[in-house]
């Protein structure tokens, strides 16, 4: 029997993790294998959202970040509009792409439902001017605070989440949604990086997961950090692994919640059901 004590390990109203725009970018099996589920409850990081059983966040409004809002302005100096590369969080590689290329985007301006700043970066990251962002292009565009590239697992996970065409690539609309997703995770990462080191320690991760509504032991949190941390004297987690871990926890929580039809915080599964549930959700 799998169980969450009193249902308290469900992400609660203390905060919602970033997810795709309602309507979703993973309605079916993603490119690369597996099923990424039905999506996460949309939400931001302000006041607590009304919760369902166990404080699980119910679907609400989309996070802030519409065109003309915090993303607006001219071409960004970094992938999150935070000035030129050199800051600690998720900055792009020093301009391997140069100026915005002409190509298949036309001259009609920013497409509908696409953030202007995300559109500028889409044009820069789309190195082959194909009109799509590949796994390789996405990986080349994103780095951690220690200037390491985002790992393949996280990049593939994000491609799978926002690939509407199921071809292993992201179009401009999907990239705009991914842009917002990354912006939210970067903000959350900065919030919990309390010592401003550019990485998340096991203590900081424990605090982050607790405020997201998870009731997980320090031993489990230390296991996550040791599994996904950088090789250093003091184990710590970079932005890419933070995104991967928190997103996967949310996916598995949703899988558990679907089986917990009695809303009791525990379920009984056969071994094959457990393996199937896990394998179908893991990327």
UniProtKB/Swiss-Prot annotation:
Residues 21-108 are annotated as: 9 X 9 AA approximate tandem repeat of [AP]-P-G-G-P-Y-G-G-P-P. It is a peripheral membrane protein. It is found in: Cytoplasm; Endoplasmic reticulum; Membrane; Cytoplasmic vesicle, COPII-coated vesicle membrane. Residues 113-148, 149-179, 180-215, 216-252, 253-282 form the EF-hand domain. Transmembrane segments: none annotated. Residues 31-44, 62-84 have a biased composition (Gly residues). Ca(2+) 1 binds at residues 126, 128, 130, 132, 137. Residues 203-283 are annotated as: Required for interaction with PDCD6. Keywords: Calcium, Cytoplasm, Cytoplasmic vesicle, Endoplasmic reticulum, Membrane, Metal-binding, Repeat, Ubl conjugation. Pfam families: EF-hand_6, EF-hand_7. The keyword Membrane applies. The keyword Nucleotidyltransferase does not apply. Sequence repeats lie at residues 21-29, 31-39, 41-48, 49-58, 59-67, 75-83, 84-91, 92-99, 100-108. SMART domains: EFh. InterPro entries: EF-hand-dom_pair, EF_Hand_1_Ca_BS, EF_hand_dom, Peflin/Sorcin_CaBP. Heterodimer; heterodimerizes (via the EF-hand 5) with PDCD6. Dissociates from PDCD6 in presence of calcium. Calcium-binding protein that acts as an adapter that bridges unrelated proteins or stabilizes weak protein-protein complexes in response to calcium. Together with PDCD6, acts as a calcium-dependent adapter for the BCR(KLHL12) complex, a complex involved in endoplasmic reticulum (ER)-Golgi transport by regulating the size of COPII coats. This is Peflin. It comes from Rattus norvegicus (Rat). The gene is Pef1.
